Amino acid sequence: MNSGMTGTIMLPDGSKVWLNSNTHIKYPSEFAQDRREVELNGEAYFSVERDPNRKFIVHSVEDQVTIEVLGTDFNVDAYKDNGFVSATLISGSIRLSYVNAEKEKRCLLMRPEDKVIYDRVQKNVDMCKTDVERDISWRDGTILLRDTPLDEVLWTLSKCFNVEFEVRGDHLRSCSFTGAVSYTHLRAHETLRHL
């Protein structure tokens, strides 16, 4: 998906994928008989068609993180330039596999409202309950903020508008924001003004 745009695609098995700005997904024109595999660089929301005979597997680019499901709804944020990969489970269950700092393969079973964040540098994970609505608000062209630090707000705007921000003054970094802004018909500076 191009910068500043979001969109949806239908995969060969009927699964639907919402793609966030600057997201790339690779998949075959036809899935194998025993598995359905895609490779993701960016952020995507998956609504996977249930198929008990074929796992659905998402590989994050340049990482040793995979997500396996049979049929469920989940969001993955795996931009290769991020220092992390995160997965948020909306419904069903998923198994997230990763390789830790000792090069051992580890697996976590996620339940609805769980969020896992894999640190690409430290090669460890943190799992917690999350605000699912906030994590997937980008699908509707909305930025949903709940006591969100400035750095996170600017990162989100960077993804939406393909711009970079410079913060002058460390006192601003301690600011946090709460609210909702629809950005589909706004420019970056207009969105900032609404915040």
Predicted feature locations:
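A residue-level detector for the "anchor" residue at the start of short, highly conserved motifs
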Residues: 1-187, 193
